[in-house]
Amino acid sequence: MKKYFMIVVAAILATFLFMAFSRIKQQESLSGSYVVLGWNDLGMHCANKTFAKMCILPPYNNQFSHVIKVGDANTLPVVQSAGSGFYVTYEIPGNTYSVGKTDFWTYASQLFGTTISPNIGLTGMGMTGTMLDSLNYFYAYGIPITPYTDVNLTTESPFQLAMLKAYDAGNTLLATTQNTIPVSNEINCVSSGCHTSEQDILDEHDQLPAFNNPPVFCATCHADPALGMPGNGTTVSFSQAIHQTHGSLTNNCYKCHPGPNTQCLRGYMKIIGKTCTDCHGSVSNVGNTIESGRIPWVNEPQCSSCHDANHSENPGKLYKLSKGHSGLFCEACHNSTHAEVTSENANDNLQNLTLQGYAGPLKKCEVCHGYIPAGPGPHGYNPVGIIPISGNIPTSSEILPNYPNPFAFMTNIPYMIKDEGPVKLDVFDLSGNKITTLIDARLKAGEYKAELYANKLSAGTYICRLSTNGLNYHRKILVVK
């Protein structure tokens, strides 16, 4: 079995190496000049809870980060690269150990042919450590986290927060952030109601001698690209076997993918009503397309299936491996697959909410640039509050009715500027307390709109005030919850 362990580790590293409070103080630029962005690659990592009979997936989680030196009006931001002397550490506050929360280490030597130290994962990473660096990002593969915190060993907490800390070569703490490190054991074939026991699954393979000597590692025979396991070459991949066998029995993805309690599909696609099958097709379709030549985990649905080229992956790459603005990973600003911000889960939104004051993709230019640059940014996006509507020059300055109104999530606030000059757009409550400033910049004459998110607003009536060239204009807006 030792050769299987070596295959797993080598293949996992080869596959991923070049791929790209307790709420503790979340995102903090301690020196005032650095930002660290963290993310997980998949939106959910699954693992068996018990390994006495078989192993579908071991404890294995990933974290990534960028460290950015904030720019100013005269200097562009700098994404710190490998060899710069900077480094990033990771930890999971409230979850400091895994031994005892799972029996993985009891059976690891039988499954992988070698002894693995307690609380250390397949790649040698522990529950805390220093991330490795590659090009312009930092990474940690194989963190052996379980969904159980130190104070609750029986109830899953699938959306815990990792703490990332960025340091310079002199060991000065520069910035911190917290981002989701998702994990679930809710892939159990028994708890799903499909099988009476794990032994029942092994009995389906009773013609194979190895199944009389558990635990059995499924990927030993069934290829699993997620683990870098090639299989034995004589049977179908694990994904094909599972989806084709069960496709005629259910079209409920949460029978296996976590799960009715975890609800791992939680991102913006979920919010706007998309389901698993909208992108992946039916359970049977997932298996049948593999039989037709698709490689699971490698050939997956593309953003470009619905979005234009300006909002799509890099050619030939998955979303999780694609990069955009200044070489940043797409997930650094938009978050993980299946958990795109704005997410239904508060922890997914925490990093961007802390950085820019509202949930959603990271698009407040000042976070990295230190000021609002002129002209459009990534995806042709203009800074919040400075979104041109048309090239028309208005005959008067005015704040127009917002839409939708009332609103619960986000509203657009159109406004017109007659003459070039300083512009402020503020939001007040009915007591006259300023809630937020949407724009404070010098604008040319034109028609614009601002976006206001309701995540920090209680239900009620608010006043938007547009100030330009010594005059004020007001408009009521209504928030519902």
Specify the residue positions occupied by each region the protein language model found.
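Surface-exposed, short loops/turns at beta-strand junctions within beta-sandwich domains
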Residues: L153-P158, N455-S458
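Sec-dependent, cleavable N-terminal signal peptides
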Residues: M1-E28
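Glycine-centered coil/turn sites that cap beta-strands in beta-rich domains
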Residues: G385-V427, T437, K449-A454, T468
